[in-house]
């Protein structure tokens, strides 16, 4: 429940924010990746509930939806077609299949490979398709620089302050 999550400490007394709290705090200042992945309850109303919050806070131009589940991205496209969507891919055979072949047939504006599966060739290939590449989860400064040198559009990180510092100097 939300109440139980609010009791957790994520470090330094910080609590897990709701999406509404994130939008209230930094919604107009940053471009935010909103992940729509629900592994155990794939047929719940996650997408619809997130779309409601996005509309309420008028964040359509400030976000990107991403998910490992193409079905969720398809649902998001029907509800908010103007919001770009990125397909997340795992570091396994299924992820390779999605990255290599199936991605080209989906209605996605971006590919989100694990940083271990990101290389200069794949970045160029996806960019030639007119789509963007955002790699996850990149927390190492050297890896951030390498990805930037390859022309990646952005990174998904646990440390936005570090990424901002590294990418501004690159």
Question: Model-found features: residue ranges?
Answer:
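Metal-dependent phosphodiesterase/phospholipase catalytic core, i.e.
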Residues: 1-90, 106-109, 113-115, 127-129
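C-terminal active-site rim and adjoining tail of enzyme catalytic domains
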Residues: 11-14, 21, 87-170
